Swiss-Prot record:
SUPFAM superfamilies: Rhodanese/Cell cycle control phosphatase. This is tRNA uridine(34) hydroxylase. Belongs to the TrhO family. It holds the Pfam family UPF0176_N. SMART domains: RHOD. NCBIfam families: PRK00142.1-4 (NF001136). Catalyzes oxygen-dependent 5-hydroxyuridine (ho5U) modification at position 34 in tRNAs. Its EC number is 1.14.-.-. Residues 127-225 form the Rhodanese domain. InterPro entries: Rhodanese-like_dom (IPR001763), Rhodanese-like_dom_sf (IPR036873), TrhO (IPR020936), TRHO_N (IPR040503). The active site is at 185 (cysteine persulfide intermediate). It comes from Prochlorococcus marinus subsp. pastoris (strain CCMP1986 / NIES-2087 / MED4).
C-alpha cells in the first residue's frame, strides 16, 4: 500500500466498558489486522477506550462501525488526519485499569465532567481576563507548542497532575469563585478527565476544549489560531504543524525528548546517542549501547530498509 494514503483516526470515549465487550473488540480487531494493513495503539479499560488506528479508508470505516456498536449512545470523540507513511509498526491493544492514567479511581468522567467548548468559542473564552488556561499535557509536549499565556504544570506524566492541582491551582484562583478554568490537551481525553477531577474537588466554571488541540487546528485558520508552535503526538510523526502535517521535530532515541532542527545542530547532539536534554543523564555504558543500536540502524538504512524504534 505504499502508493496509497493512510487514514489516521485518533479516538476516545468514556463509558462503562463491559469485560465481554472488551474481549470481543480485541479479537475482532486482531482478526482484521491478519488480512489487512492495519496498525495503531488502542488502550481499553472499564472506563472506556482511547487510541489511534491507521489503515486505508475502507478498513478504518469497518473499525469505526465495530467501535460505535460498542460505545452506543456515548460520545465517541474522533480526529482524522492522513499520512503517506504508516505511523505505527503494528497494531497493539493494551487492557489497563485506566484509558489515561491519573490514579484517582473515585472519579468518573462519563458521569461528571466539565463543559465542552468548541474550537470557535475557545478563542473568546481564553481571551477573557477572568479565565485561567491550563495545559494538562506533559512538560516535553508543552515545550514545542501551546496556547498563548497558558499555565504549564510541568508534569512528567499525567498521574502527577492531581498533586499539581492540590499544590498550585488555588494560587491562580484565589478567593474568586467566578474565575473560569479552561483546560486543554492533545485530543481531549486528558483535559476531560482533568475536569472530572476538579469537579470532584469542588471547583466551578470548568471548561475543556472539545477534541483538543488536534480538532482546534483542524477547525481554525492559521490567521485566527491562538496556538503557537507544533503539537506533539505519540507516534512516528512526533509533531504536527497547523495544517496537521508532519512537523519539524524528531525524537531523541536516548531520552525520548522532541528535538528541533536547531537542536540537532547543537555540539552535544549525537544521533541516537544523546541530545542536550540528556547529555548528563546516562552512563558511559548506556551510551555504548545506544551507539551500537544506532550503528545497526544506519546499516539497515543503507540497505534501504525501513527501521522504526518500537
Amino acid at each position: 500500500m505504499s502508493n496509497n494514503i493512510y487514514k489516521i483516526v485518533s479516538l476516545y470515549s468514556f463509558f462503562s466498558f463491559q469485560e465481554n465487550s472488551i474481549i470481543e473488540l480485541k479479537e475482532n480487531l486482531f482478526s482484521i489486522e491478519k488480512n489487512n494493513d492495519l496498525s495503531g495503539l488502542l488502550i481499553i479499560a472499564r472506563e472506556g477506550l482511547n487510541g489511534t488506528v491507521c489503515a486505508e479508508e475502507g478498513i478504518i470505516e469497518n473499525i469505526l462501525k465495530l467501535i460505535k456498536n460498542i460505545v452506543g449512545n456515548n460520545k465517541l470523540n474522533i480526529k482524522v488526519s492522513y499520512s503517506k507513511k504508516k505511523i505505527f509498526k503494528k497494531l497493539k491493544i493494551k487492557i489497563k485499569d485506566e484509558i489515561v492514567t491519573m490514579g484517582v479511581p473515585e472519579i468518573n468522567p462519563s458521569e461528571d465532567s466539565g463543559t465542552y467548548i468548541d474550537s470557535f468559542s475557545w478563542n473568546k473564552l481564553i481571551k477573557d481576563k477572568n479565565t485561567i488556561v491550563v495545559d494538562t499535557r506533559n512538560h516535553y509536549e508543552v515545550s514545542i507548542g501551546s496556547f498563548k499565556k497558558s499555565i504549564n504544570p510541568n508534569t512528567e506524566n499525567f498521574s502527577e497532575f492531581p498533586e499539581w492541582v492540590d499544590d498550585n491551582l488555588g494560587k491562580y484562583i484565589g478567593d474568586d469563585d467566578s474565575k473560569n478554568i479552561a483546560m486543554f490537551c492533545t485530543g481531549g481525553i486528558r483535559c476531560e478527565k482533568a475536569t472530572s477531577l476538579l469537579k470532584k474537588k469542588g471547583y466551578k466554571n470548568i471548561f475543556h476544549l472539545q477534541g483538543g488541540i488536534l480538532k482546534y487546528l483542524e477547525d481554525m485558520s492559521k490567521e485566527e489560531s491562538l496556538f503557537e508552535g507544533e503539537c506533539f503526538v505519540f507516534d512516528k510523526r512526533v509533531a504536527l504543524d497547523h495544517e496537521l502535517k508532519q512537523g519539524s521535530y524528531s525524537i531523541c532515541h536516548a531520552c525520548g525528548m522532541p528535538i528541533s532542527i536547531e537542536d540537532q545542530k547543537n555540539k552535544e547532539y549525537r544521533e541516537g546517542i544523546q541530545c542536550h536534554f540528556c547529555v548528563n543523564k546516562f552512563s558511559d555504558n548506556d551510551r555504548k549501547r545506544f551507539e551500537e543500536r544506532q550503528k545497526q540502524i544506519n546499516k539497515l538504512k543503507d540497505k534501504n530498509q525501513k527501521v522504526y524504534k518500537d
